[in-house]
Structures are given as structure tokens and as C-alpha cells.
């Protein structure tokens, strides 16, 4: 039995990591929480922050690694919650890999309003991105998703637990399904 791929995305501060952790931890099946930031932070020499000009080639490589890791887990029977900033331009590699491997793929965009996003980001600790201009730019990247606009969840008024519940329901109902 193969697993399912769930790409859980949105701008920094949207709650992706917290929600992905809840979805993966409370799952009824074998489930992996794939933190895509790890694939970027593994680059020790020549790293370019992925939102800066000049990062496109690096980002293409990192997305290929993400897709490979996610599909390998799923082929092994694990559901995979891919937690990261996965814009529209990186949906095709996930879609192609899912189609080729016969996997189910859902694309879920957490998109709180900008004020909520910036507020949540200010409250985050650690070495998370704090540049309001960069966060605003990444928020704008998810502002108009064209044919995938129906894959957006406005989480402005939801806490992490409520958002995780909504994600589970939506994925179960196939609302955000792209493949399968």
C-alpha cells in the first residue's frame, strides 16, 4: 500500500510547521512530517536564502530532493506532510512524481491575511525569517493562485488545532486533491 502526499504550504508565519506537526502526529496511518527547511539548511557552502535573487538554481535542486524524499516515503507506505514554502512554480515536479508513482497528491495553502501573518511571524522564536519585506513578498506569492485558488484556507481566525482539523477534513474530502 502506498502513502499519500500532502503539500502543506503558505508564507512564513502561516502556521505550516505547527499544523503539519499536528496532522502528522495525530494521523491514523504511518505518517512523516517532512520539514523542507532542513533541505535548505543542509547546504553549508554557497547557500543563498531561497527568497533572494540568485537562488533559483539552488531552489530547483532542493525541490528535486524534496520530491524524491517525499515520494520515496510514500512508495514505502507512509503518508507524507510536506511542510514548506512551495509556490505554484514548484507544483509541477510534485504532480509529475505523484502521477509517475501512482500516488495521491493534495496541495493545501494556508493563507492568513498579511497582518496575521506578520504578527505570527513576530511571535516566532529561533532563527525563523524576520524580514517583514521578505515575508510580505512571500505572502504576495500566494495572493493569486489562479486555477489553484480553491486550494486556499484562510486561517486568519483559526488557531493551530482548528487549522489542523480543517486540513484533515479537507484532505479526507479530496477538496485539495491534484492527483489520484
Identify the role of each PLM range:
Residues 5:
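Walker A (P-loop) ATP-phosphate-binding motif of ABC ATPase nucleotide-binding domains
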Residues 8:
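Hydrophobic anchor at the beta1->P-loop junction of P-loop NTPases
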Residues 11:
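P-loop (Walker A) phosphate-binding loop of NTP-binding proteins
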Residues 15:
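Conserved glycine(s) of the Walker
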Residues 18-71:
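Conserved substrate/cofactor phosphate-moiety recognition/catalytic segment
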Residues 57-101, 105:
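Glycine-rich phosphate-binding loop used to anchor ATP phosphates in small-molecule kinases
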Residues 101-121, 153:
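Conserved phosphate-donor/acceptor-positioning beta-strand/loop module used by diverse small-molecule
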Residues 123-169, 173-180:
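Small-molecule kinase domains that catalyze NTP-dependent phosphoryl transfer to phosphate-bearing small molecules
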Amino acid at each position: 500500500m502506498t502513502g499519500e502526499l500532502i503539500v502543506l504550504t503558505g508564507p512564513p508565519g502561516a502556521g505550516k510547521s505547527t499544523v503539519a506537526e499536528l496532522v502528522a502526529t495525530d494521523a491514523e496511518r504511518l505518517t512523516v512530517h517532512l520539514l523542507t527547511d532542513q533541505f535548505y539548511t543542509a547546504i553549508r557552502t554557497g547557500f543563498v536564502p531561497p527568497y533572494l535573487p540568485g537562488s533559483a538554481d539552488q531552489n530547483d535542486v532542493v525541490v528535486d530532493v524534496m520530491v524524491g524524499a517525499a515520494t520515496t516515503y510514500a512508495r514505502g507506505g507512509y503518508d507524507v506532510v510536506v511542510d514548506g514554502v512551495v509556490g505554484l512554480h514548484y507544483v509541477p515536479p510534485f504532480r509529475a512524481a505523484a502521477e509517475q508513482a501512482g500516488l495521491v497528491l493534495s496541495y493545501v495553502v494556508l493563507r492568513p491575511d498579511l497582518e496575521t501573518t506578520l504578527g505570527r511571524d513576530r511571535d516566532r522564536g529561533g532563527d525563523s525569517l524576520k524580514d517583514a519585506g521578505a515575508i510580505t513578498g512571500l505572502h504576495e506569492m500566494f495572493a493569486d493562485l489562479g486555477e489553484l485558488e480553491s486550494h486556499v484556507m484562510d486561517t486568519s481566525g483559526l488557531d493551530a488545532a482548528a487549522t489542523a482539523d480543517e486540513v484533515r477534513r479537507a484532505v479526507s474530502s479530496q477538496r485539495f486533491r491534484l492527483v489520484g
